[in-house]
UniProtKB/Swiss-Prot annotation:
UniProt cross-references to InterPro entries, sorted A to Z: Rbsml_bL25/Gln-tRNA_synth_N, Ribosomal_bL25/Gln-tRNA_synth, Ribosomal_bL25_b-dom, Ribosomal_bL25_C, Ribosomal_bL25_long, Ribosomal_L25_dom, Ribosomal_uL5_bac-type
Protein name according to UniProt: Large ribosomal subunit protein bL25
Gene that produces this protein: rplY
Function: This is one of the proteins that binds to the 5S RNA in the ribosome where it forms part of the central protuberance.
Record organism: Nocardia farcinica (strain IFM 10152)
Highest taxon of source: Bacteria
Keyword Signal: no
Length: 200
């Protein structure tokens, strides 16, 4: 995770839904910066620049904030996206220091093809991990290559990158490999079978 994600921010002095709407209309994202026992700071981020960083580095992106000339590293903790129009409505940012370990939820990506006749179900899309803020992985890969029916992959059995430890319950079921349901015959096939039986 790079710390080169420079993002300019300005301090917001207006609060409430009306102020947040005005911030978004101006092309910005209302955000709150908190952590390290400091008072929460209400910020305004450039929407396009922030969205570009999230697209490249994921929802746990570390930001190098320039708050009106003052530099501050921050971890993106949560992002609220409008369910229909898909713009960013709000963001929560956590103050971090170099070398500091943080806990974050990261996406689990399933790769590979399980054995024939199986169906892979992903029971958990994220797991919670602990790592240095600047070294948080964007995602954790889990391979199901040639996995047989009955294979279960728990959070505790996932190989994590060096320097990353599991914060989730080790027994959390992440991937389950089950038997694929039998294909139902098409209506035409059923009719043909019935006709064949009648002819006999």
């Amino acid at each position: 995770m790079s710390d080169a994600n420079l993002l300019e921010a300005s301090v917001r002095t207006e609060f409430g839904k009306g102020a947040a709407r005005r911030t978004r209309r101006a092309g910005n994202v209302p955000a709150v910066l908190y952590g390290h026992q400091s008072e929460p700071q209400h910020l305004s981020l450039n929407a396009q620049a922030f969205a570009a960083i999230l697209r490249e580095h994921g929802t746990n992106a570390v930001l190098n904030l320039d708050i009106e000339g003052k530099k501050q590293l921050a971890l993106t903790k949560s992002v609220v996206v409008h369910p229909i129009r898909r713009y960013i409505e709000h963001a929560d940012l956590l103050i971090v220091k170099r070398g500091e370990k943080v806990t974050a939820d990261v996406a689990v990506t399933v790769t590979g093809d399980a054995a024939p006749g199986t169906l892979v179900t992903q029971e958990a899309t994220t797991i919670s991990i602990e790592a240095e803020a600047l070294n948080l992985p964007e995602a954790i890969e889990v391979s199901v290559e040639d996995a047989e029916i009955g294979t279960q992959i728990t959070a505790g059995s996932i190989a994590l990158p060096q320097g990353v430890t599991l914060a989730s319950d080790p027994e959390l079921l992440v991937v389950n490999v089950i038997a694929a349901p039998a294909a139902e015959p098409a209506p035409g096939e059923e009719a043909a079978e019935a006709e064949g039986e009648s002819a006999e």
